[in-house]
Swiss-Prot record:
Name of this protein: Lipid A palmitoyltransferase PagP
Cellular component annotations (GO), alphabetically ordered: cell outer membrane
Signal peptide positions on this chain: 1-25
Species for this entry: Escherichia coli (strain ATCC 9637 / CCM 2024 / DSM 1116 / LMG 11080 / NBRC 13500 / NCIMB 8666 / NRRL B-766 / W)
Gene name in the database record: pagP
Oligomeric and partner information: Homodimer.
Length: 186
């Protein structure tokens, strides 16, 4: 190996280490923004929201048929929340919801959600969103031990009505669930 290859490898590693330092430096800033958004949503909500679970779907490629035949995919339940739109047009929400899980047992979840929102049509009422939710849930098959969740969010909406969804990743016969609900803003 000649000297130029060593210089190239050293430069690559050095640049990566500098990048990691910047990530950690920005982590404090990101966490401060996260906490401030939660506080502002709680203290200054623009809307009160009603959540109605709509569907759970277990990805058929990731399950044995005999398992999916037994699972509940009609997650009736409900929830309430507070939300606001920020100066960039992005959505922030605090919510609590309970629904019937795959085993038809109650599963509560509460947390904070954020979506970057686009309004691609001339009609400003139509909106699309992509973001995340961070919260806590508890399941019967885990003895209702509180479990932290960090999941993706996506939505399509018109005015005060939004169809919002997430995907719970997993392994074979576990997780890999699409979950969606309606959110009505008042």
């Amino acid at each position: 190996m000649n000297v130029s290859k060593y210089v190239a490898i050293f430069s690559f590693v050095f640049i990566q280490l500098i990048s990691v330092g910047k990530v950690f430096a920005n982590a404090d800033e990101w966490m401060t923004t996260f906490r401030e958004n939660i506080a502002q949503t709680r203290q200054q909500p623009e809307h009160y929201d009603l959540y109605i679970p709509a569907i759970t779907w277990h990805a058929r490629f990731a399950y044995d048929k005999e398992k999916t035949d037994r699972y509940n995919e009609r997650p009736w339940g409900g929830g309430f929340g507070l939300s606001r739109w920020d100066e960039k047009g992005n959505w922030h929400g605090l919510y609590a919801m309970a629904f019937k899980d795959s085993w038809n047992k109650w599963e509560p979840i509460a947390g904070y959600g954020w979506e970057s929102t686009w309004r691609p049509l001339a009609d400003e009422n139509f909106h699309l969103g992509l973001g995340f939710t961070a919260g806590v849930t508890a399941r019967d098959n885990w003895n209702y031990i509180p479990l932290p969740v960090l999941l993706p969010l996506a939505s399509v909406g018109y005015g005060p009505v939004t169809f919002q969804m997430t995907y719970i990743p997993g392994t074979y016969n576990n997780g890999n669930v699409y979950f969606a609900w309606m959110r009505f803003q008042f």
